[in-house]
Amino acid sequence: MPDTVCRPPRLILASSSRYRRALLERLGIPFDVVSPDLDETPHDGETPAATALRLAAAKARAVAATIDAPDGVLVIGSDQVATFDGLQIGKPGTHERALAQLVSMQGREVEFHSALCLYDSRTGEAQVEDIVTHVRFRSLPEAELDAYLRAETPYDVAGSAKSEGLGIALLDAIDSNDPTALVGLPLIALTRMLRAADYPLFATTRGDRA
């Protein structure tokens, strides 16, 4: 009897972020990682939401264009932009800039836009969504902020607070429809998109998808 099983398309995470990779691994589904080569500079006059959505879609499309897959691929692109006092907050890159970020946000609310795109190369369809998270920071002594930074070295994280680690101690409250959005990959939105693309999330084993 011929094999009539319809196999799902290859799933690719378009990201170099170890945090996003760790989140996607929670779902227990097979995927590959390809880092997009993309200029992530915001456009003049672009809102934080527009920047995040544009970059998430651009990452997914850029990676899809490099993949030779006759059966198609599903590519996950994600981008996060933080905004505070009307300005976009980037990744600090250094200890000094991270400390300055945290000091400026003491007792204040920061808005995080976690944009997600699922691009289906079979149809050319791109599902996109922006999940907004409001975060209120505690007021802490600068010495504690410095100690946190030396412990976590979150210099590749927008806003300098890694909520999945010790950074949670910097926060008073998190308000979001998706608890994984703040870490960088909104899994509630992603699983909704995968279902819409007919991806079999509940296959019993990895072998069922091979």
From Swiss-Prot:
GO terms for biological process: nucleotide metabolic process. It catalyses: N(7)-methyl-GTP + H2O = N(7)-methyl-GMP + diphosphate + H(+). It is an enzyme of class 3 (hydrolase). Its cofactor is a divalent metal cation. Its EC number is 3.6.1.-. The active site is at D79. GO terms for molecular function: nucleoside triphosphate diphosphatase activity. One of its GO terms (cellular component) is cytoplasm. InterPro entries: ITPase-like_fam, Maf-like. Belongs to the Maf family. YceF subfamily. Nucleoside triphosphate pyrophosphatase that hydrolyzes 7-methyl-GTP (m(7)GTP). May have a dual role in cell division arrest and in preventing the incorporation of modified nucleotides into cellular nucleic acids. This is 7-methyl-GTP pyrophosphatase. It comes from Burkholderia lata (strain ATCC 17760 / DSM 23089 / LMG 22485 / NCIMB 9086 / R18194 / 383).
